[in-house]
Amino acid sequence: MEIDDIFASKKANPANEKSNDSKSEAKAPKKGAKTKSTPSRPKPTNNQDDLFLDPKGASGRKRTEEGFLVYDEEELNIGQGGGTPDCPFDCQCCF
């Protein structure tokens, strides 16, 4: 059996189905017939409490135009420590 013979029957079937579908579509729209419309889903609302939200926003972190993360002074410990002679590079107070 040839491959073309197998697929020839497959090609003939969609042509028959299309002609049957077009006939049924022509009969479907009748005057005075009520059409059912599916009810739309209600839009979800944000029920999150503002007291428990992250102050930096829901998206996580701010980013620069290049895509780098933006850190604030508290995260970098700027202004904290610096009381030892090893500061700012060899100290253990800033960690």
From Swiss-Prot:
Coiled coil: none annotated. One of its GO terms (cellular component) is nucleus. Residues 1-64 are annotated as: Disordered. It holds the Pfam family DUF1764. Residues 35-49 have a biased composition (Polar residues). Residues 18-28 have a biased composition (Basic and acidic residues). PANTHER family: DUF1764 FAMILY PROTEIN, GROWTH FACTOR 2. This is Uncharacterized protein C6G9.01c. It comes from Schizosaccharomyces pombe (strain 972 / ATCC 24843) (Fission yeast). The lineage of its organism: Eukaryota, Fungi, Dikarya, Ascomycota, Taphrinomycotina.
